Structure formats: C-alpha cells, structure tokens
C-alpha cells in the first residue's frame, strides 16, 4: 500500500512500478501507480479537508509543521540512507539534503510573517488592512534530484498558509516520497490535508487536469514545465509556479588563485553528478595564458573524480546518476557535441555496464556553430573562450534560459556590470552556481521559470492577498460629494 489518501494507506490501481538502486541494481521499492480515479479521490479528500485546515490559526498549523521538523531530526539517519540509496548520491550529500529540510521549517515560518502576514494602517475614518488567504487545493510535483528538499520547499509553506495538497513524487524516487509522507502522518496531519499519489506521466497528467484544483507547484525540467503551462493556459484562476532548468553560464575572468577557481568550478558543474538545475553547463573562459593554465588544471583535477556507491568509504565526491538511461543520455550528448566539431578535453566514461556511475566530461566548443541551447542534466561541461568582458556577457545571455549565472573575478566593477546586464534569477560572484540560501528567492526567468521563485518567496505563491477598508461604525460624512442632497426638504 503506497498511496496515502484521506488518512489511509491504499494500493494503487495503476501500473506496477519497481525502483532499483541505480548503481547496484538492488530492488528498493515496489508498488502501483495511482489511476485517474484515485487521483480524483485524493482531490476530493483535499477539498473536504480544506475548510477546517484553513480555519485553524497559524499557531495551530505551525504546531504540526514543527512536529514534522522534530521527526525529521529524529529520523535523519534513516531518511538520509533512503534518499542516498534511491538517487545514487553519496551519503554525505543526502545528509545535507535532510538538514536543509529541517532548516526549511523555521525559515518558512519566518517567511510567512514577512511575506504574507497581516498589516494594518490607520486612516482618518478607519483603517486599511492586508491579510492573506490560502488558495485551496494545490498539486505539488516533486523532482528526483532532491526528492526530499525540493518538494518540502513547496509543501511546508503551502501547509502553513492553510492549503491542502496532493503530492506526486517523481516516478524515479517513490521510496523517498513515501518515507517523507510517513513522517507527515506521524506528525498528526488531519486526514486529507496532505495526500500522496505515486506514478509517472499518466498519473501526472490526471493530476494536472483536475478541474477542482486551485494551483500547481512544480520543480523539474523545462519540457515538463512547458507542457504544464500549456495545459493550464486559459485558466487564470489557478496559480502555477514553475521552477525549471537552466543552461547556466559561469564566467572565469582574471583569477589570483587557480586552484580556488577550479574548486568553485567543480562545485558548480559536477556536484550531485551534475544533476542540479543551477549547475554550470557553459564555462566562459577568458582567452590567454592564465585561462590555458586554469583549463589544464580543471581537467587534471576533474580527471581524479571517481564516482562511487552511496555508502563507499571513503566517501566519493559524486555518486551515480538517477538511472543508467540518464547516464547514457549524457554520453550521447557529448558524442553529438564532438561530432559537431567540439574538442574533447575530458571524455565522460561509464565505469560499469548497467549502472549509472559516470565520470565527468569537459568539451571545448569555441567556434562551433549551431550548438543546441539545451540543458544536459549531468556531469558534462562545455567550454567557450572569450576576449572581452562585454563579449562574455553577450555569450552568457545567449540562451532562452535564465536560472543562474556566475562570475569569478577580483573586480567588483565587473560584477556590478553583470548585475545590470545578466538575464538570470541568480547571479553569484566568486561563489558556486550551486550555492543557494533559503533566506533569498530561488528561481529564474525565461525558460527557467514563470517569475514565481521559491525558497524565501515560496510564501508568495501559497496565498493570495486580501485588502480591506474597515471602520467599526458608520456615520454620514460631514462633507458630501457634489450633487448629493440629504436635507429634509421635499423635492417638488
């Protein structure tokens, strides 16, 4: 029984699904997808639970959410192992994900008050008030790269605001989704407030097509995000928050410490086996001897990165990709770039057949025409050389995406110029592209999102503002508008 609907664990009536460890092939989870009728059942449960949940005070909802945070802390080791085994990422990185989930609770509570709390300003004849109200029933689509943290960033603020939820984890991480749901169950959420439906494309399409849905919160690929946008077009009554991918540029200008710059680049391009939406996909490197030395050092250090299993000791920097198919797609993308005229500096290699252990790849594309503006979701870095900083900015902006952009340079003036001219929701200076702060917004523009960033701003799309003009008494104004006559004279 792998679906959680209206406070009960039930068996899915859709297709059967098996999840294996992407490196060892070990069977981790077996279950059945939710069919369309069960998706509708989850929606009815969420709709029925909404009025009571929304009428609770914030303090009452906060008690449940904080209880969930405590359960995360007490079950940190177990959840870390589940996420690591299912995604293929090393234990150390999965542990940081669970820590981020715990920290998200306090941050979301603070953001609720700052972004969507209540305000009141006195007026001569009364007061003006601002309040926020929950949308109602929201669907949350989770990604596979951070199956705990990223859905958590939607679910927690949505629950705090008073919404009820139907959560569909990625079909590639059903075990993690179920494990998190069982902690919410222990936290004491009332039946129907949070419902779990497992499944792939068919389940997702049934969920996004629900008429009685008030909104959809999505983190994932641009292709799926575009499909959801088309599906919900013409329905302005439904809130749609899209956080999608990127073809992110990292500009390496003058550097004083080559090893520090190489470290930042590896953290930007290859952490999580390149499976972060903010990962650097395009390295823009200044022409010249220093750039040559940097590139040689980057290749040398990257060549030593050997992916390993989640529990290998000593721990590897990167683990496997989410699946063998995902790893093979990266290899295919590299082969296509090479066929276009790219110069391979470091070839990506599958370490074993039928696993997802893939070494990083680096390929120079300077002067190659027609390079696709697409995100390769894995450890593959493309390199272009530039002559002037103005040229670098033009190259950085030459993409339909707009998620993250970074600059490595000692010159503050160049960063100020980049801040003015970059088309990206995240612009970093001497920091990895993959670094993020939950106290700041997280999201992009263009094909990377629809201007509804998550993290600190998630509270914004989880509630709508209600403005009120208020007075505790009603009296006739001393001065009336022209043409109004309230005298006792009889009009003849």
From Swiss-Prot:
EC number(s) stated in the UniProt entry for this protein: 1.2.1.71
Catalytic activity: N-succinyl-L-glutamate 5-semialdehyde + NAD(+) + H2O = N-succinyl-L-glutamate + NADH + 2 H(+)
UniProt pathway annotation: Amino-acid degradation; L-arginine degradation via AST pathway; L-glutamate and succinate from L-arginine: step 4/5
Domain of life: Bacteria
Pfam assignment, any one: Aldedh
Function: Catalyzes the NAD-dependent reduction of succinylglutamate semialdehyde into succinylglutamate.
Family according to the record: Belongs to the aldehyde dehydrogenase family. AstD subfamily.
Name assigned to this protein: N-succinylglutamate 5-semialdehyde dehydrogenase
UniProt gene name: astD
